[in-house]
Amino acid sequence: MGGVDSDFFFWLVHAFFYTWLIFRLYFVFFLMNEPREEPESFWKNNYDQLSHIIFDAYGTLLSPSKYNIWQELGKRAKATREEVWRALAASDDLQEILDKMAIPKASQKEFMEKVRDDIAQIQPHPDAIPLLKYLKERKYSLAIDSFLIPLYAGPIKEHFSDYVEKFVFSFEQQHMKGESQHYFDLLQSLNIPAHQALFVGDHYRRDYLASKAAGMNALHLSNKWGKVGKEKLATLDELLTVLNI
């Protein structure tokens, strides 16, 4: 019996190890497929044939949201991040979302007021609209690519529809921002080769590294914390100096 128990334990340990290993490999190669570091082989930006400029939205053109709707909704509904994402991505009707997530009626009013106040306070950065207006006058085609949910799409269209030709929102895409295929889909939707596009954003991996990896030009609107791209902007209006226009 001792031998049987030992064999069982041996195979149990190995089964656990290989299950963990398979999960780990899946996580690394599929779930975390956005680049993590900037390879030395990345080419320098070349703006000679630039025709399209793609901007991130929140944190780049707009002040970021201050209310963590993901965390708050997950906590109140006792739901996973994936469950919260599915609910938020499916609708721009906050009442419908709260009902679907079984948020108690007693706390729905407070939650809705906080979200609406948060959305109302979102404003363009002071240099954003003058910059977009000038770029449009110089015949650049402008796009916005944002990782967001339907509730937060309104401020983007409200402030930038006069200047931006195309809006790309994560909840409308098969591949979300951060996934490598997202950037190839983006280029296809714009009907341009990668070298004619410039991506500008404040997220080191999703805006800078991932767009570079897809062959685009990219500029990192750097923060005072975290990693900073080799080709960067300190402020939005510095873009005009970089492009020499």
What residue ranges belong to the model's regions?
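Short, surface-exposed acidic
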Residues: 77-88, 102-114, 164
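Extreme N-terminal basic, low-complexity initiation segments
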Residues: 2-8
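Asp-based, Mg2+/Mn2+-dependent phosphohydrolase catalytic module
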Residues: 16-55, 129, 133-136, 140-245
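Acidic donor-diphosphate engagement hotspot in glycosyltransferases and nucleotidyltransferases
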Residues: 64-66, 127, 148
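Hydrophobic alpha-helical core bundles mediating ligand binding, dimerization, or RNAP-core interactions
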Residues: 69-74, 94, 111-119, 152-156
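Metal-dependent phosphoesterase signature
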Residues: 94-129
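Alpha-helical elements of Rossmann-like donor-binding domains used by nucleotide-donor carbohydrate transfer enzymes
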Residues: 68, 72, 96-100, 114, ...
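Active-site neighborhood of HAD-like aspartate-dependent phosphohydrolases
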Residues: 33-86
